[in-house]
């Protein structure tokens, strides 16, 4: 019983610093407190540092407060992924499972974030806050994937509340303030105004500071054409929209998670070719 109580209130912290050494990005784990840790870090052929992030508790429990801080030095490139889905366990009271991510990208750096799906269990309460700061010519590919619950156990939108906030700043000014509040008991998420027949949600943010509005509109049109080709009513829906400056947002709804994960990478394939003239490294979870 004492162990369970202790697990319910973990204050985990992971601080990652990426620096450039001999034209390759190197990771320094400045701080780590359980349950957060780095399982593996290795270099890719183009000098990118590829990192697996792991929660040894298997998920986020009610009362947990977990913080991840990411700093990229100038001209570094990092790709982050998770070792498994993020499970949000049930709350027997009013304690919220909480995660915070803060990322700071220096000039000409590039961060790619490819997590597994977040799965909120029945009766769970979850809050996630993300803030990303971009310097001049910094680039970003950031995705979030959300499941309706444990469908194999008959859980679909059975959680109590889910809050997802994401703020992106470029050159000190906000370009995205994204707020999502899902409360199934009040919102009837199966209504067509919300998820309708679909169960899984993908949200992607693609940015590069310095591109002008004309360039972003051209990329938006290209990705919208791809979105139309991937939209299949009853199976998946996709949409793309420019931000106020320096980026765009992509959203997808699907009846399964596999379609979202694979198609998300295709969006980045188009975007990275346009933004950097290169082909992205395939996230290992899609192999």
Swiss-Prot record:
One of its GO terms (molecular function) is nickel cation binding. Keywords: Chaperone, Cytoplasm, Nickel insertion. It holds the Pfam family UreD. GO terms for cellular component: cytoplasm. The keyword Cytoplasm applies. It comes from the Bacteria. The keyword Chaperone applies. Belongs to the UreD family. HAMAP family: UreD. UreD, UreF and UreG form a complex that acts as a GTP-hydrolysis-dependent molecular chaperone, activating the urease apoprotein by helping to assemble the nickel containing metallocenter of UreC. The UreE protein probably delivers the nickel. This is Urease accessory protein UreD. It comes from Herpetosiphon aurantiacus (strain ATCC 23779 / DSM 785 / 114-95). The gene is ureD.
């Amino acid at each position: 019983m004492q162990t369970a109580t202790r697990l319910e209130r973990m204050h985990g912290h992971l601080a990652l610093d990426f620096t450039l050494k001999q034209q390759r990005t190197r990771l320094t784990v400045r701080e780590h407190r359980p349950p957060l840790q780095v399982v593996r870090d290795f270099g890719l052929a183009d000098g990118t540092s590829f990192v697996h992030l792991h929660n040894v508790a298997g998920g986020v429990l009610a009362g947990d407060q977990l913080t991840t801080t990411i700093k990229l030095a100038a001209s570094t490139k990092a790709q982050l992924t998770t070792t498994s889905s993020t499970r949000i366990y049930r709350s027997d009271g009013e304690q919220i499972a909480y995660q915070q991510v803060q990322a700071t990208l220096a000039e000409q750096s590039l961060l790619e974030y490819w997590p597994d799906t977040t799965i909120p269990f029945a009766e769970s309460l979850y809050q996630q806050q993300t803030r990303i700061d971009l310097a001049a010519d910094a680039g970003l590919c950031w995705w979030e994937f959300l499941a309706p619950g444990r469908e194999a156990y008959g859980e679909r939108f059975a959680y109590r509340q889910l809050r997802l906030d994401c703020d992106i700043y470029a050159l000190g000014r906000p370009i995205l303030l994204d707020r999502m509040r899902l409360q199934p008991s009040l919102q009837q998420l199966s209504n067509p105004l919300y998820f309708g027949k679909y169960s899984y949600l993908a949200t992607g943010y693609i940015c590069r500071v310095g591109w002008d509005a004309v360039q972003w509109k051209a990329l938006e049109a290209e990705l919208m054409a791809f979105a139309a080709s991937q939209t299949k009513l009853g199976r998946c829906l996709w949409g793309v929209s420019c931000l106020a400056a320096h980026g765009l947002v992509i959203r997808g709804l699907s009846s399964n998670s596999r379609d979202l994960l694979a198609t998300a990478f295709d969006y980045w394939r188009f975007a990275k070719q346009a933004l950097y003239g290169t082909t992205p490294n395939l996230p290992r979870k899609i192999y």
